[in-house]
Every structure is written in structure tokens, then in C-alpha cells.
Amino acid sequence: MSAHSSSQVHPADGYAGDITPHTANAWMQSGEAVMIDVRSEAELAWVGFVPGAVAVPWKQWPGMAMNPAFDEGVKAAAQGKKVVLLCRSGVRSIAAAKRATELGLEAYNILEGFEGDANADGHRGTVGGWRMRGLPWRQN
């Protein structure tokens, strides 16, 4: 990791660190990292996704049961690069980053997630998040 990159990493316990959506996008665009979106297939379909991200759900819908194929999927997606993990608001991706680290990967959590925290009215997408920050995303 370059000195410039390390200044953008917030220390974390159990994984390589937390990074902003903009840092994750820069690393992904430069080929330095692979983005793994750990949201469910339903979330990707209904809410939107990041082009180029690899979908490896941490939990599965319905019921949000653990994905038994997570370990295999995240290792295959990494391709020898560091991984940046994205979820809805930056919570599931912490657990996924810890697991990826246990598997021997250099794993980072993307702060704020795809949608960010809910605002005072309970709506997401207005208080932080990949989408609100104007970074690349699509919706089917």
C-alpha cells in the first residue's frame, strides 16, 4: 500500500481498515482493489448496484441466513488484490471484512455503504453512502 493510500485508511479491529466511498472508487478504478458487494440479490435488484463490483452476498434473502458460499466466492473474487466490501450502510460489510481477513485477504470496509444511514424521516440515500456521494451506480 502506498503512503498516499494508507493516509485514507481508518484503523479497524479485525480487518485492514475502513475507507470512504471515494477511496474505494479510486482503488477500484486503478485496479488496486476488487469491490465485493455483500448485499442480498434482492437489494441489488431493487435498490441498485455498482458496475464492476462482484456480488457475493454475506447473508441470503429471505430470512437473512448466512451464505454458505461466501468464503469460496470472496476468495475467487479477490484475484490476489485487496478487497473493499460494500453493504447497505456499512454494518454487514464489517462482519464480511473480518471474515475475509480470516481467510487471508487484505479486506477493507467501505464506510456509509451504498445507501448510508437513514435521515430523520427514516429514508436512506440522503445521509452519506455511495449513491449519495455521486459515485457510479446503476439500477435495473
Tell me what each language-model feature is.
Residues 85-86:
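Short, surface-exposed ligand- or partner-binding patches at beta-edge/loop junctions that are enriched
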Residues 1-33, 41-82, 93-140:
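Rhodanese-like catalytic fold shared by cysteine-dependent sulfurtransferases
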Residues 37, 90:
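Conserved G/P- and acidic residue-centered "switch" motifs that form tight phosphate/ATP-binding loops
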